[in-house]
Amino acid sequence: MTTKIFVNLAVKSLDKSIEFFKALGFAFNLQFTDETAACMVISDDGYAMLLTEAKFKEFTRKEIADATKTTEVLTCLAVDSKDEVNRIVDTALEAGATEARKPMDYGFMFGRSFNDLDGHIWEIIWMDPSHVQQ
């Protein structure tokens, strides 16, 4: 099955979140972006919908998790090199993110994690392609 994925995340300040993720190198699909939502392009088939809390509440009757106190999701992105892992996470930290945990290095896999401006955890990993079975 081929499908696209949209991860929906509630944010306190849409403008600050857009600025933060643009600093990391992400682009936004303006067709699905307005004053209540922003469609962040992760890949051809992967997107993060950054939604104001009011907009997010339109999709659920449940309370919105405070991501600074509880983890509702851990979003993991795989990149092409260890250098890219470090570039993204270092840029995130410079833009106001906080380190979620210490870096992990298993030789064939390297990763670092950060909490974004709203406390959502983003893990950026690299895996040695020769180690991954096809």
Where are these regions (language model features)?
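Residue-level recognition of short loop/turn positions
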Residues: 1, 45, 117-118
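N-terminal beta-strand motif that seeds the catalytic metal site of vicinal oxygen chelate
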Residues: 1-18, 72-77, 128-134
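Core segments of cupin and vicinal oxygen chelate
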Residues: 8-56
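Membrane-topology and secretion signals of cell-surface/extracellular proteins
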Residues: 24, 66-68, 124-125, 129
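Short beta-strand/turn micro-motifs at beta-sheet edges
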Residues: 60-65
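Mid-chain, well-packed structural core segment of small domains
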Residues: 73-90, 96-97
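Vicinal oxygen chelate
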Residues: 89-134
